[in-house]
Amino acid sequence: MPEKFIVLDTETTIDFDTPLCYDLGFAVVDKAGNVYESHSFVIAEIFLDEELMASAYFIDKVQTYWKEIKKGQRKLVRFSTARWTLIDTMKKYGIKIVMAHNARFDYRAVNCTQRMVADPKWQYFFPFGTEIWDTLKMAREAFGKDEEYATFCSEHQLQTSNGKTSFTAENIYRYLINDATFEESHTGLEDVLIEKEIFAECVRRGITEGKLW
């Protein structure tokens, strides 16, 4: 059986130092990018708080979330439910590695949310011993010397504000599908399905480790 990993993404309120997660998506994948299980959770304690959601990055999506919740495409749950679902999923597949693109931010977001809304005896979201990998770190290694990727970003003006090559998930995925007009959904699970493709491409390019710490 191929080794399994979890790819995770969050959408949060706007406070960078203490971001609070209102959308948490994750998928179980292998190194080839195959998906074995996925979950899309809208976090009730944050999403139903109008004051907190007023500072959400993508507040314009609130009505879309409600429609998708009613259709069963996403589940409105307490944060503890999302956490225990992830923990149970890790146990089910024997997963020790969780990754995200720009993982420091998502790691901070789930821990900040955990400390604000959940049982205070659990200070950290992930089980003890979980390895956190960063597909951004992996992508910089995999694409950093790729002249074709640098040219793609330059030709389509997909560079950073200071003119350097961008390694956002959106821009890397644009390159992978050769479509500079592609736009990320900026919803948890949908962005996960982009990030798992980036992970798989990094592995194909020989980058097989992305430990953040």
Protein language model features and the residues they cover:
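Conserved protein kinase catalytic core
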Residues: 15-17, 140, 197
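Short alpha-helix plus adjacent loop in nuclease-associated cores
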Residues: 132-160
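Substrate-recognition/cap helix-loop segment adjacent to the acidic, metal-dependent catalytic center
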Residues: 104-133
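Conserved non-catalytic scaffold segment of RNase H-like nuclease domains
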Residues: 2-113
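Short, polar/flexible loop-turn hinges at active-site or ligand-entry regions and domain interfaces
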Residues: 69-73, 120-126, 179-185
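Acidic, Mg2+-coordinating catalytic module of metal-dependent nucleases/exonucleases
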Residues: 97-104, 108-109, 153-213
